[in-house]
Amino acid sequence: MYNRCCRKVWIQGRVAYRPAYIRQSPPQQTLYRGIDLLPFTTIVMDHQSGFQNPSPSGGLMFSASAKRFISRIVGFVGRGAEVQQKAVGLCPLKTERRRAAAGGLLLPTGLRMGRSIIMSVRPLPFLTGPAPSPDTAAGFKPSPPTGNLVSVSPLSKAQMALWFDYLQHPTSTHYFLTLKVELDKQPLSLDKIIQVIRGLGKQHAMLRTTFHVDTDTDDMSKSYMAVHDDSWDQEIHVLMNDAQLYEALRKPFQLSSESPVRWVVQMKLQPGSARSTYTVYAAGHHIGVDGASMSVLSNQLLEAVASEVEDQPDHSGPHYGDYIQRQARYLRSSAGAAAGRFWLSQLRHTQPFRWRMEPPEEINTPNYRQLDTWNFFPTAEIQEWGNLYKTSWFRVATSIVGLVTAAMAEPQAHHDHALMVAFGARPRGFENNVSHMANTMPVKFPLSSLLRDDATFSDAVKAMGRNVSTAKKHENFPFMSLMEQANRHMDPTLLDFKVAITYSPKLANKSCELFPVEGIWDLFFCFLEQEDGVALGVISNPRVFGAEALGQLQSLFNEVFALSKARPSFKLSDLAFLQNRTPARFISGPALDDVESISKSRVYRLIKARAASQPDLVALMSAEKGVQMTYRELAAQSSQVAHFLQKQRLCKGDAVLVHLERGFAQIVWILGVMEAGACYVALDKTWPAARKEAILRTANGKLLVTDDEQMDFEKQDTTVVFLAPSAAEIASMPQSTCECEVADDDLAYVVFTSGSTGQPKGVMVEHSNLSHYVSATRSLVKTGPHSRMLQLASFAFDAIVLEYAVTLAHGGTLCFANHPEVLVGEYLADVIDSNQVNFFHCTPSVLSTLPAGRRLPSLRIVSVGGEASPPGLLDHWRKRVELLHAYGPTECTVICTLESLTQDESTQTAIDATVIGKALPNLDIRICEEGKLEPLAPNQVGEICVVGPQVSRGYMGQEELTASKFHNITLADGHPSRLYRTGDKGFIDDDGKLHIQGRIGNREIKVRGYRLDLYEVEKNVMAFDPEVTQVSIQQVGESLVALVVPASIDCDRIRSKLLKDMPRYAVPTRFIRVASLPLNTNGKIDHTQASSLAAELVMHDTVLPTVDATPTPTAAVRAVGVTEENLRLKTKENGMERQEMLRRHLTAEVTALWAKLLGSSRQFDPEVGFFDAGGHSLLLTQLHKLIKERFGTGSRPSLLDIFSMSSIRKQVDCLMGIVDQDAMLGSEPTGGSSSRSQSRRSAETSSSSTSAPSSVPVDAERNLYAIVGISCRFPGANTAEQLWNVLMEQRDAITTFCPAENLGFALEENSVFVPRYGMIDALKDFEPSAYSMSDAEAQTIDPQKRVFLDVAADALADAGTSASPGNPLDPVGVFVGAATNTFLSSRDNPGSKPPGDEEPQSFANHYQQLLDCPIGTFASFKLNLTGPVVTLNTACSSALAALHLACASLSHGDCNAAVVGGVSMAYPQEGGYVTARPGGDSSAVFSPSGVCHPLDSRADGCVPADGAAALVIKRLADARADGCRVYAVIEGVAVSADGSDDKAGLGVPSSSGQSRTVEAALRRAGPQALSRLRYVEMHGSGTPWGDALEVQGLKMAFDRLSKTGAAEQSGTGRAQPEADRIYLGSNKGNCGNTEAASGLLSLIKASMALNLGVVPPLPNLAEPNPKCEFEETKFEPLGKQLALAPGDRVMNKRQRIVRSPNWISDATWFVISTVDNLLPKLTPAAVA
């Protein structure tokens, strides 16, 4: 035998081992299954080979990503810490042949004998396993495999989850399962039993398998299984007492050195007889075996011991590796995708169990979890039980488990729980395979929908049965894959599963018994099939469930079980533990169709009834303040208010004005006022004084309650109650319900609409109206106990009735925000999350501000109404929640029709936003002609009229208006009713649904949910300023715009007057002065034409200078991990001057943003608040977004900062403490940003900075070239800033792929396919329309062209070049180095012919590649550039060769600016590359390990990659004159070929050739270049000899320069010490070899390093490449960050960086520097 070292091949994050030594021998000796490397390839090795791996060193360390991933697999490892216990004490085991201490038994060779531990174990409850032990010390690490192996393969998905758990808790036994087989009824010898066990080991590979982690990595996903050959020493214990049995069965597995099944034979001597009886135990770890495996083993064990044949037939079936491959294919299939969608649906809207009981104070249980047997169900009984429901009894039992576990948990309104259900998940053909295939998956028990529908238990069984049935179809989808998907869509805290259910089929016969895994769940229900029935056992977490709680749970199970047999159709709401949890149900309230009883009910009494029934339910809460109020407290305090009001001698119908801050007190007073028989009128505290006074007059209020002792309006004759001074008196009032007779037609409240006239319209709502509305909502608004409703509406707005009355009458909780005025955007999302809001009502305008990226897991229902709803908005939210599209005038009590759009993620049906549903119960919607009351036929358009008990009394004090809108009618059944004409136009379709089509005649609108009459607003404008001769108010977007005549009007003065007397929403945001307004034929203002005029003027009014949205340097500095001190840019100004400059700069910036939103023609007072200047909450969110984008300040300022600091001055004060002073003064204020498409088409932007005079003489600048624009796409980076982060963080940006089943090429002998490649994410954002292309046309164009077009356009935009596209007098050249176009002939090209297609092709198609337009020409055409165009290919030096030509073209005056690019994208995209096997062709360029290590002793080649980049360069003098931002200055350039004299071959670099090019570049850069050189960015391909030859070339060049004295003059009159080290680096270890684009990648890296003053190190440098002989040179590979000192202006010193050559036969070198006095204008973020 001999050992062979193995090489590792990484396949989708999993490891497979391959022997490095490959014999040229027949395939039976070394067989590779699946040579094309399927995703989970099993590699079978030579049976004669050994296996050796280096010994592990150090402890097991989890990477940060591994820890995060492990923490997310909550279903397996997330709860281990909750049930920790002491590790079981173990004694050492011996492997040598020895005599047993007890009984004198001679053990066969290879068996292991355990020493005795005295312990009484009777009976054997330990077979369910102890709880998990604490996390192990850091010293634990699995060992590598030893011995003779036959195969290695990756772990299955399920095994990976269990392996993660094992690595965290290696001494835990919570995934043990044990098979017990009694062999006492037949005479057997021990030798026979041992022979049978060994036979099973030969037959089943899993019994010879160990588990391991790659020793060279800390990535736990790179784990694998090793299958040993038949000589593997199975662990068999032969024992004689229970103490030894305990030790053997409970001993933790060492899965890296023993198989996952441990055999224990307990021998018992019969008294007075020489015969012994035996009991065989198979103690298994769940990673290797499941229940079905134990069933297979029990059958085969009994069959084998009864057989006379020694060698039993192999029934094991396919190899487990085949199962893993099948699983991988399944996950990539459409069936796998469908399964993933189903399982995600089972998690959607679920919450973890939150147990109601307190954990037990003392835990007096053993250090294991016990299986507590609850019931035994005889076979006949359980079959009859299932027949009652025409389904499997297991589905009935699962439904009961769902009910009783929900009873033990806190109610989760609108959410369900998921039960972990175990599935066999064995594909056909694997029935006899001993392995782990069981799959425990979450199945939703839909209790919330069942309660909502008032379902029966039979309905519950059907619903759960459907879920289980569908789950069974998708049982092969792994739990790990589900968790990976769920973590992308859900909050990981929701993936905490606490209840599991399993069904274990019967074993071979009664002599067999299976002890299930204990698991990590709080409750594990085990249904164990036996010969004559099914036993139910429960394993519980003793730290969660004490004896009392378990007893209660068992009683509930038995109760529901008995009820389910006696009465299958009992209502779930009849169960005691589910009473008062049904949503949309009153406590002792009227039926939905009992009109008379509803009219006599009172909403405040319904709330009182809830308080009496469920007093401890939370009625009101605020998560921000951490306060809440129960129903008991709410009822008591509202009754105290009622008694207090009666003491004030209020009469029925008297109006009480409530002038309070939004909060609990508002609700208390509203309910108290109604209980006292009065009606309430809510006054919004933000309203102007005149508005409040007008309402006070109209309402004739008798009493006003306020918490504002300094009221800003006249109270007239109204009695005022100040809240604070009256608090003690109110608290002394009785808490009993106030006895007051309130009639059906008594007023409940008055809400004032429009408010734009001098006499506001007060809608009078009676108690019966309110009762009918709240009752009717039960039909669709399914809120109930524990539902949480957000309080969002103003209390003066009728939507507040939906929020408080519906929520509290149904037992829900109303949630308050600290700042309700700004409940939009991120703040709204924050409040929803912090309060766990389930339901809220808002306008479409507010709903549209919610960030699309916020998950909002608690949110289930959204009601939207108050204004027209965009179809796209409805469609988006319909896919996330249940959407209620509501319609209802205030005059009809909040809402009169509802369209319920149930959640449907997959729907493709467009929503008709005009459909607003059917009438609520007891209401009737009629369509009438104007001025008539007779209803029109269906589908005829007319005025929408509402008839029924929700129609209010009319307008307070406006009898004439009431008579025109409200009509008393008699219904067909003779009952009187009331009709309201809405003024809305619509029709009723054949399904009875109402469609709305705008307004009829008048100019009443809704803006941000507020109803407004534009005519009344116009009258007020005319009244406030007699100089106004004409005015037209129009709605543009969410704002009001006033067109006023004449043009000399002072609009600010008018607006200030309006704000004093009108609500803010009724005051136009913008006033636009015009010379005249359009008139119609009657000489009146034509408001239709005026509307178009207003929209056009607003559009032109908002054209502003472009805002520079570049992030500040502070953000970029933090991103790259460099200290600000290192990057601080020095200035001459003192601190005070800088502060004042910054304030002026910020003031101009913020003012520009205000102007963008509110009108650029306006002058803004810095002290005026945003709302007073015309803003509103929706515009405030836009302002907040613009400020954050403009200043890049992370989480600050928040929306609340902008709200509370509402003036320009205060916002500037806020920003002064946030922004980076030096960086901000490097840019000038502008006003907006152009779109991506515009930047591509025009490539024009305004410059963000100008440069100061340079210390470089003008004549010296003739051959200096400035880099003024940068754009790139490289692996792991779509911007230069992202590239910098990759480099600084030393990240490996190469992608590891799962190889395709069929590669596009054949593997040659001794070749290997490496599934690693540097991919770029560059095509998804390509917009064909931006370049006048169709999508179809773009798909046929070489991706290299598409990507380069993007980067070229972005680079031009970044440069802010003054060049004019298409102007021949201002030419811009294009010089691009590009790889060969392989897309034309690839299978990825839609235009290419499939293999075997013999159809004749046209000449153009046949010669397509020959005729293909060069990339440079294509780009110049699409970007309309008129300078010289060159496209070339010199392999890796292509981009720098193009740069050399561009510099020459600029020098000759051929163009004024040049776009220089490099692009390389290979097709087809195979997801890897082919190279020589390890130890094969030493000249191979590509790395067989898949990792590039430049200048490192581990270097074995490079890794290919795609890439694209573009620079814009100008002559330095032109760049300075144009005020361009300069990234770097090119000082020296040299290009040459090596020739052939001293080259080993075409692809081998020449040291002498390299040295000549380096020397030439440095000499052209001037005498200062060499003296200040600190760093060389090499090509660094990562080939051992290539890197060495490159270093040798540098050494030769520097030796010659030193001898000629080039280094003696530093430019400052002093010599530079030659002992200074020069550091070398390369980017190939980060991004791979990007071929034609690689030169620009290095140049971008060097430019950024100069600007930021730090050079990124080589990634993970180990030992330097010894072939480079660094000790003989002044060069050193850069292993850590290198700080570069900024240039000193006085001394005029500069840093230089040299760019190195490519790996073929020509070389291009550049020397670049910064211009010192331009440095303050450079920002790190500028390269983004």
Swiss-Prot record:
Effect caused by changing residue 1579 to A: Decreases TeA-producing activity to 6%
Protein source organism: Pyricularia oryzae (strain 70-15 / ATCC MYA-4617 / FGSC 8958) (Rice blast fungus)
Segments of this protein annotated with the region Condensation (C) domain: 153-499
Record domain Ketosynthase family 3 (KS3): where: 1262-1714
Gene3D superfamilies from the UniProt entry: 3.30.300.30, 3.40.47.10, ACP-like, Chloramphenicol acetyltransferase-like domain, N-terminal domain of ligase-like, Nonribosomal peptide synthetase, condensation domain
Name under which the protein is recorded: Hybrid PKS-NRPS synthetase TAS1
Summary of the function given for this chain in its UniProt record: Hybrid PKS-NRPS synthetase that mediates the biosynthesis of the toxin tenuazonic acid (TeA), an inhibitor of protein biosynthesis on ribosomes by suppressing the release of new protein. TAS1 alone is sufficient for TeA synthesis via the condensation of isoleucine (Ile) with acetoacetyl-CoA by the N-terminal NRPS module and subsequent cyclization conducted by the C-terminal KS domain.
Effect of residue 1581 to T: Decreases TeA-producing activity to 67%
Record annotation: effect of changing residue 1581 to A: Decreases TeA-producing activity to 4%
Gene, per the UniProt record: TAS1
Region Disordered, residue ranges: 1225-1256
O-(pantetheine 4'-phosphoryl)serine PTM positions: 1177
Effect of residue 1633 to A: Decreases TeA-producing activity to 9%
Domain notes: TAS1 has the following domain architecture: C-A-T-KS. The N-terminal NRPS module contains the condensation (C), adenylation (A), and thiolation (T) domains and catalyzes the formation of the amide linkage between the isoleucine (Ile) with acetoacetyl-CoA. The PKS portion of TAS1 has only a ketosynthase (KS) domain and this domain is indispensable for TAS1 activity by conducting the final cyclization step for tenuazonic acid release.
Low complexity bias spans: 1226-1237, 1244-1255
EC number(s) per entry: 6.3.2.50
Effect on the protein of changing residue 1579 to F: Impairs TeA-producing activity
Mitochondrion as UniProt keyword: no
One biological process term in Gene Ontology: amino acid activation for nonribosomal peptide biosynthetic process
Family matches, as SMART domains: PKS_KS (SM00825)
Family membership: In the N-terminal section; belongs to the NRP synthetase family.
Coiled-coil residue windows: none
Cofactor(s) required for function per UniProt: pantetheine 4'-phosphate
Disruption phenotype: Impairs the production of tenuazonic acid.
